[in-house]
Amino acid sequence: MDKLKIEASEALAGNVVISGAKNAALPILMAGVLAETDFVVTNVPNLRDVNTSCELLRCLGAEVTRSDNSEVRISTSSLDHFCAPYDLVKTMRASILILGPLLARFGTADVSLPGGCAIGARPVNLHLHGLEQMGAKIEVEEGYIKARVDGRLKGAHIFMDMVSVGATENLLMAATLADGETIIENAAREPEVIDLANCLIAMGAKIEGAGTDSIRIQGVESLNGCHYRVMPDRIETGSFLIAAAVTRGKIRCVDADPSTLEAVLAKLEDAGATITTGSDWIELDMQGKRPKAVNIKTVPYPGFPTDMQAQFCLLNVLAEGTSTITETIFENRFMHVPELIRMGANMELEGNTCIIQGIERLNGAQVMATDLRASASLVIAGLVAEGTTIVDRIYHLDRGYEHIEDKFKGLGGQVVRVS
């Protein structure tokens, strides 16, 4: 099993090209099931979860081809299977997003209950309840969600009990081919939801309000394929900015979108970083400065993202002062804390809050990645730790970061993949 070996590195410097957003690419690939003609998606990152999504589409009978330049072409003319099996779904929670498109276009879907990062319950009941309101008949048996609808789904006024990105995306896709109008209230406002909606609109869908908490969809008879470019990955961008901040370096993230990172950039400025932005780049300068501690509370977009919590934990570990980080989105999302403590961090947990006293330096250690974003924080920790750090179980990392060791090397980081 691969590991990353990391040595203490100098201040990061240079440019890093940001990949397409995993959390936008996955639902957009699933939306290919809705298209009656060929569908081409570009700026698709080369990640484990993306490969799993492509394999899932092939398992359903779709023709999926991937070129070397981050382009995926999908044809559903031969799609004739409607079951997403356990062996594929167990490795990736986003597989649940195939449910809405299959049901909307073909009237039937059997989807294994999903897997993915072990960071809390994250139940699928919001997905199922919304589809039931649209006329679907759903049973959960033998580990599978079995959904059927006679004819087409029907438009509905859906009130989400809580904000859920995945449920918003699933219901949004399903509603595009439903009879009549669907309104999703308390919808997720994340940029990835907007990106999916823009893709669906390019396919012929009628959608208003994406990016607000009320999305209105007028169902259409059919959707066609299109050419669509996936948005930049805001979490990858934020992760590299954190790495530059803790190494007291200066980097520029190119092919980035600063408008999707306002809460993160504001906190980095509070920590003492100088931030400069253009339409498609972000520059961070922390040369010669130690970060200042910043308090964080994760909330749904446009607030501070839960996917940046682990990285800011690390920043605060090395910052001047005491800080608190409160996690309100997911349970069990402080599994990186014991690993950082192994490296010398001064941290303690009280319920869903982590209290951190900043220290000058970490020590290299053998640590274990527990989920996608936690693994990123451990890799960055290795860049500033004295000695050698080994990060095990980096298959988590490969689910969400494209060529991370090569990108760090390009900035001066000493990171190598070993078996």
UniProtKB/Swiss-Prot annotation:
Q: What is its EC number?
A: 2.5.1.7
Query: Care to name a GO molecular-function term for this sequence?
Result: UDP-N-acetylglucosamine 1-carboxyvinyltransferase activity
Q: Which residues carry this modification: 2-(S-cysteinyl)pyruvic acid O-phosphothioketal?
A: 117
Pathway named in the protein's UniProt entry: Cell wall biogenesis; peptidoglycan biosynthesis
Kindly state a single biological-process term from the GO annotations of this entry.
peptidoglycan biosynthetic process
Listed name of the protein: UDP-N-acetylglucosamine 1-carboxyvinyltransferase
Tell me what reaction this enzyme catalyses. phosphoenolpyruvate + UDP-N-acetyl-alpha-D-glucosamine = UDP-N-acetyl-3-O-(1-carboxyvinyl)-alpha-D-glucosamine + phosphate
- Organism of origin: Shewanella woodyi (strain ATCC 51908 / MS32)
Say if the entry is tagged with keyword Zinc.
no
Q: Which residues does UniProt mark as catalytic? A: 117 (proton donor)
Q: Which of this chain's residues are annotated to bind phosphoenolpyruvate?
A: 22-23
| Known function | Cell wall formation. Adds enolpyruvyl to UDP-N-acetylglucosamine.
Is the keyword Mitochondrion in the record? no
